[in-house]
Swiss-Prot record:
Protein name, as recorded: U1-poneritoxin-Dq1b
Record bears the keyword Transcription: no
Keyword flag Cell cycle: no
Keyword annotations of the record: Antimicrobial, Secreted
Length: 9
């Protein structure tokens, strides 16, 4: 799951 806003990381 994306832990950031849009980033997939």
């Amino acid at each position: 799951l994306p832990l950031d806003d849009l980033s997939d990381t």
